[in-house]
Design a protein with these regions (language model features):
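STAS-like cytosolic regulatory interaction modules
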Residues: 1-51, 61-107
Length: 107
């Protein structure tokens, strides 16, 4: 099960589980709330996300576009190898900002 949580000071959304058609609604709401409540870039911590389906990828692209329109960035942080492969196969790693180093402990 995906459990989106975020810490506003760091603009980090922590995800766990699978980002798919069943969970994308909750994640979309969390991301939109964070974007609306903050001014900085949005970081999505994917360290504990096992897989992302087409619906999840669509959400990431839509969020990327929304943050760009606001002059901000979406950063996908420390995705698991399975998610990195999906991003590479779909070539979204060329569009989305993917940071492969782990988040600092304080995040």
């Amino acid at each position: 099960m995906l459990a989106p949580t975020h810490s506003k000071p760091d603009n980090v959304v922590h995800l766990t589980g699978i980002l798919d058609v069943r969970t994308v609604g909750d994640v979309r709401q969390t991301l939109n709330d964070l974007i609306d409540a903050s001014d900085g870039d949005v970081i999505v911590d994917l360290e504990a996300v096992d897989a992302v389906d087409a619906t999840g990828l669509g959400l990431l692209v839509a969020t990327h576009r929304r943050t760009q329109l606001l002059g901000r960035h979406l950063v996908l942080w420390h995705p698991m190898p399975s998610v990195v492969r999906i991003l590479a196969v779909t070539r979204l790693h060329r569009v989305l900002n993917v940071e492969r180093t782990p988040l600092p402990i304080s995040a």
